[in-house]
Each structure stands twice: as C-alpha cells, then as structure tokens.
C-alpha cells in the first residue's frame, strides 16, 4: 500500500515567478525557475485534484514536459511525500478510520503501542516519545501560517509530548488556555508548556500571568488588566488548539488544588478540557468558584477550526467519547489500545 501527501508551504515561499523566468522556461536551474509556490500548485493539481499533466500544463500556461519536471522537483524538495506502508501499518490505518467514523472526527492519528503493565517501563515514562510523532503530524496538517494562533492546554500528556521534536511552524502565536497553578508539577504550568511548544515549532509564546482560579476580590481586577486581556483576546482568534483530556476527577491521583473534589457536582463529571469539567453528555459541570475560572470555555472549543486532542488510557475512554460527540475537538491523537477500547464501547 502506498500513501502520498502534498505538504503545505509557508507564506514566505508563496511568491510569484520572476518575470525573467517564466513557467515554461527550459532553464536547468530549478531553484531560479520554479518557486516552491509554483511546485506546490502543480503538485496539488496533479496529486490531490487528480488533474492530468496536460490539464496542469494548461492551467499553469506551460508545457507537459515542464509539468513533469515540476512534479519531480516537488518530490525532491519534499513538497510531495510518498510513503510505502507495510501490511501491519495498513491495518493500523483501518483502526484509525473506524475510530474516526465512530467518533465523528475529521482525523485520527494513531501512535505506536505504549508499554503494557507487564513491561518494565510505565506508560508515563515513554508517553511523550511515542505520541510526539503522531502529534507532530497532526500539527503539520493544521495548515497554520505565520501569525495564526495556536492554543495549548495544560496536562501531563501535552507536557510530555512537548519534550520531543515537533514539526516547525515558524511565526505561529502560541498561547495558554488556562491560568497558572501553584502546584510544583510542570504539567500544571501552562506558561511552561507554552514555552516548550513554542521552542519546538519556532513559534512566538504569549504568557498568561494570572492564576487559574483567583479569589473573588482579585478576579475583577485581573480580567481588566491589559496584559491579561491581550492573551485572552487571542482565544477567539485561534486557528488550532492542542489539548489534553483529563480523566474523571474522582478517579485521579492528582488534580489542580483549586478543584474541590468533595463537591457533589463533580460526581457527574467524566473528564475535563482546560480545567472545564463535563458529563457523559458533554454538558458543563460547574463547581463552587468555577465562575471565576480563567480558562477557555468548552463552548469556545467548538468554534476553533482545528481541535487536536491527545489522550491515552482506559480512564480517558469516557471523556474522549463525550468530548468528541460534543465537538470539543475534531482530531484525536491516541494509541492503538485506547482506540480499541473506545471501539468496544456500545
């Protein structure tokens, strides 16, 4: 089985041909003859839109021979990527497609397998390295351009993924979706995760210097602060979001200290995104003080064009299903075992 993809280009590559080197030029210097924008256009027409070389030539005002050279050059520069997939990975793709259909998502990206309980290393020890390639692929497919806004949530999974290489997306504005936490664990610090993600993709970090749950007296002042308003103002502009999904609060070994786990309302919660809890139907589950929470609303997630959730584990099955059906995200990065567990749910 063979898969082919045409990779998007950055805006810096999107420039017209110089007047001295028209599309039909026979110059042997492909770097001066064919811009990456032109190569991308030719490849997009031929591979994605299934136009013939003659049709591409007509659309670009050039010859078939030139189109053939363009397609070869597009492959050489990595604009067109062809992957030969062995039968095992083909089955992997079938699992991803079945999960995508079940959850009604746009895309599902499956990672390699995570360790079983019988193996020496725990899931958390290798989670980042296993999930990072699939997450990088999802981010690369988000179509982000310089100046676009990418939001990131807190959480152990996103934090672990942020330790590894991701696809460069230079010029993207990266911003947190929830205020800070006074707990020492790094995965509760969204500014730290924002910094890590920005460094990995070559983005521009925007930090939110506010607690996730300020007191009643501090909340009105904070939300009027210009520096905080600037970051909150990025939320409605988001083109994409990378988010973790929390397990049911009553089953978690650790949870933000501001969450009152003794609150009766949280008994209905199956999970959370950006510290916003929800039940099996995706309805918001409030708790005492949650009206002061400085965090992205669940309803706002539905308006973000590309919502990438990264989650693994049996305890994440229910929140993944509820979150997907509520359209809180439209893409999922997970492992094969979690995918099979979700498919087993009636």
Q: What are the roles of these predicted feature ranges?
A:
Residues 3, 30-33, 69-151, 163-170, ...:
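HTH-adjacent hinge/linker in prokaryotic transcriptional regulators
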Residues 8-9, 16-18, 28-43, 48-56, ...:
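Conserved phosphate- and dinucleotide-binding cores of soluble alpha/beta proteins
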Residues 42, 131, 135-139, 161, ...:
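Generic hydrophobic alpha-helical segments
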Residues 112, 151-157, 312:
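Glycine-rich beta-strand-to-loop/alpha-helix junction loops that act as flexible
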Residues 145-149, 169-171, 238, 304, ...:
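A general structural motif
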Residues 157-168, 253-261:
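Short Gly/Thr/Asp-enriched flexible loops that form oxyanion-binding sites at enzyme active sites
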Residues 173-181:
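Catalytic or ion-translocation cores adjacent to nucleophile or general acid/base/metal-coordination motifs
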């Amino acid at each position: 089985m063979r898969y082919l993809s045409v990779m998007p280009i950055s805006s810096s590559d999107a420039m017209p041909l110089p007047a001295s080197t028209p599309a039909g030029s026979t110059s042997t210097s492909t770097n001066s003859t064919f811009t990456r924008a032109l190569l991308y256009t030719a490849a997009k027409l031929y591979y994605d839109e299934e136009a013939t070389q003659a049709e591409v030539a007509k659309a670009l005002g050039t010859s078939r021979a030139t189109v053939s050279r363009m397609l070869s050059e597009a492959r050489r520069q990595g604009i067109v990527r062809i992957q030969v997939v062995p039968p095992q990975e083909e089955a992997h793709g079938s699992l991803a497609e079945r999960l995508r259909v079940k959850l009604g998502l746009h895309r599902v990206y499956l990672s390699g397998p995570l360790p079983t309980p019988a193996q020496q290393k725990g899931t958390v020890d290798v989670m980042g390295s296993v999930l990072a390639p699939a997450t990088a692929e999802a981010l690369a497919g988000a179509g982000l351009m310089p100046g676009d806004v990418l939001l990131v949530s807190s959480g152990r999974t996103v934090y672990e993924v942020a330790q590894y290489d991701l696809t460069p997306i230079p010029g993207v504005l990266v911003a947190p979706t929830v205020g800070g936490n006074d707990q020492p664990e790094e995965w509760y610090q969204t500014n730290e995760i924002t910094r890590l993600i920005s460094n990995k993709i070559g983005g521009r970090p925007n930090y939110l210097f506010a607690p996730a749950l300020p007191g009643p007296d501090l909340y009105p002042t904070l939300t009027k602060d210009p520096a905080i308003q600037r970051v909150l103002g990025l939320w409605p502009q988001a083109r994409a979001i990378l988010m973790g999904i929390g397990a049911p609060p009553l089953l978690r070994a650790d949870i933000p200290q501001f969450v009152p786990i003794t609150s009766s309302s949280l008994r209905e919660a199956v999970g959370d995104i950006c510290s916003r809890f929800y039940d099996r139907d995706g309805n918001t589950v409030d708790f005492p003080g949650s009206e002061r929470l400085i965090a992205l609303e669940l309803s706002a997630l539905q308006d973000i064009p590309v919502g990438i959730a990264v989650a693994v584990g049996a305890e994440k099955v229910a929140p993944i299903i509820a979150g997907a059906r509520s359209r809180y995200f439209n893409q999922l990065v997970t492992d094969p075992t979690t995918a099979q567990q979700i498919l087993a749910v009636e």
